């Protein structure tokens, strides 16, 4: 069934059922981490851009933080540069960082800005380097219980929320590439999940949405019946050591956001067309909701 095949009455019912969520979210900030299939499949890319325009025109303030891992990997391959991952994070040498800056802001960010702006003059692309939006601090990762260096990879030490609030007040949609200098001006690549959580906390967001390529959070992946629809932070912390490496940054981001005061974080299925609207405006949703213990 598509929207075209619904009766007029059914369409009206769908819209009416969204009213409680529209009222809850009106005037509020929603931070969305955009990544996975949603940014490589053309139909999903178009749907995501339309969702952002929809939120903006409903009086909701979306702030988009995008990844770009597959695109960075592809460009590294074209340039003959070897890449590596440790603990779910890309090892970032100065050479890899140059490629990441080029791809994240010059390619991925531009494409998303243009897709959103096909609906109106809404989106503005920025990086953590602009207006001192982010200050980074170098981080390591835990691999088999050992702190391991991963190069020019940072965590968010500080967020200059005022830099984004100016854009939000002007009814723009910030589209953020996660590159930021440390206190000495050395630029670091920040994991987009990590950056999205820090932004959600600093902006006092109502929700943090994390787009993934799975249906949500599984307690015993790949057992399909272990999918969790809602989990609190205490249970999630217990689960963290058993998760696959690629899911760890996303779960850490949800924990950081909710612990920092964001009412809920959501790990949602980015393979579902209009997944953002499905999660925000329907009872069923399309993923796992994380709430405070």
Curated annotation (Swiss-Prot):
EC number: 2.7.2.8
UniProt pathway annotation: Amino-acid biosynthesis; L-arginine biosynthesis; N(2)-acetyl-L-ornithine from L-glutamate: step 2/4
A GO CC annotation given for this chain: cytoplasm
Cell location: Cytoplasm
Binding positions (substrate): 68-69, 90, 189
GO terms, biological process: arginine biosynthetic process via ornithine; L-arginine biosynthetic process
Name used for this protein in its record: Acetylglutamate kinase
């Amino acid at each position: 069934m598509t929207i075209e095949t619904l009766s007029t009455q059914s369409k009206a019912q769908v819209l009416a059922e969204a009213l409680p969520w529209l009222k809850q979210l009106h005037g509020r900030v929603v931070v969305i981490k955009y990544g996975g299939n949603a940014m490589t499949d053309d139909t999903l890319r178009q749907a995501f851009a339309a969702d952002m325009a929809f939120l903006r025109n409903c009086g909701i303030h979306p702030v988009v933080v995008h990844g770009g891992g597959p695109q960075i990997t592809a460009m590294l391959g074209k340039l003959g540069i070897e890449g590596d991952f440790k603990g779910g994070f890309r090892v970032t040498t100065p050479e890899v960082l140059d490629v990441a800056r080029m791809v994240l802001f010059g390619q991925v960010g531009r494409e998303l800005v243009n897709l959103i702006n096909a609906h109106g003059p809404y989106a503005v692309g920025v990086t953590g380097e602009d207006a001192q939006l982010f200050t980074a601090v170098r981080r390591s990762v835990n691999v088999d219980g050992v702190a391991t260096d991963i190069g020019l990879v940072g965590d968010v030490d500080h967020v200059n929320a005022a830099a984004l609030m100016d854009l939000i007040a002007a009814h723009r949609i910030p589209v953020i590439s996660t590159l930021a200098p440390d206190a000495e001006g050395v630029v670091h690549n920040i994991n987009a999940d990590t950056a999205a959580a820090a932004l959600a906390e600093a902006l006092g967001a109502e929700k943090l949405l994390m787009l993934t390529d799975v249906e949500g959070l599984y307690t015993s992946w790949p057992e399909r019946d272990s999918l969790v629809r809602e989990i609190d932070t205490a249970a999630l912390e217990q689960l963290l050591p058993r998760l696959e490496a690629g899911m760890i940054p996303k779960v850490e981001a949800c924990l950081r956001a909710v612990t920092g005061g964001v009412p809920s974080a959501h790990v949602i299925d980015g393979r579902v067309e209009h997944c953002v609207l499905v999660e925000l405006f329907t009872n069923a949703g399309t993923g796992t909701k994380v709430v405070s213990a």
